[in-house]
Amino acid sequence: MVRGKNLFVLCCAMMGVWTAVSAAASVQFVDRAKALGIDMVNTSGATQEYIVEGMMGGAAFFDYDADGDVDLYITNGSSFAGFAAGQHPQNRLYRNDGDFFVDVTERAVVGDTSWSMGSAAADYDNDGQVDLYVTNFGRNTLYRNRGDGRFADATAVAGVGHRGWGTGVTFGDYDRDGDVDLYVANYVDFSL
């Protein structure tokens, strides 16, 4: 009897999986970014002639202003062709106001215009404020959250300004000592 009961449970479970797969096929996504205040054009190299032009950036979701709403930081690319003065693409920080996102990039002082690849957020200095690390094609940047809606460049002070080609980044307590550790993935070393 146990064998038959297990077979029945297995059959029911499989039917549930098939139902879930069928339901998932009908899911549709709708672009609501502009309606929610996120108005950004992500730039990548136009010619795709160089390897870096084929790479795009990322995003970090974190509560930078400690209001309980998850905010959004989006990295941007660049181009070797160059840009007119004041037209260079930059990374953006959008504050979540509950129903709408507000671009606070300039006030927060995180409008990095480097060729950014990735970002991650964590409280690296244990001051209760979530900080931000951005990887770039060039110098990476650590932004220390000042707690007043603005960030300060803490790259040199923290000694984490690698000038290679940083692509990915994450924070975690690797050695379990209670302090947040930083792990940066680099791509190509052009000096070889």
Model-derived segments and spans:
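Acidic, glycine/proline-rich Ca2+-coordinating loop motifs
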Residues: 20-192
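Bacterial N-terminal signal peptides
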Residues: 9-20
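Bacterial N-terminal signal peptides that target proteins for export
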Residues: 1-11
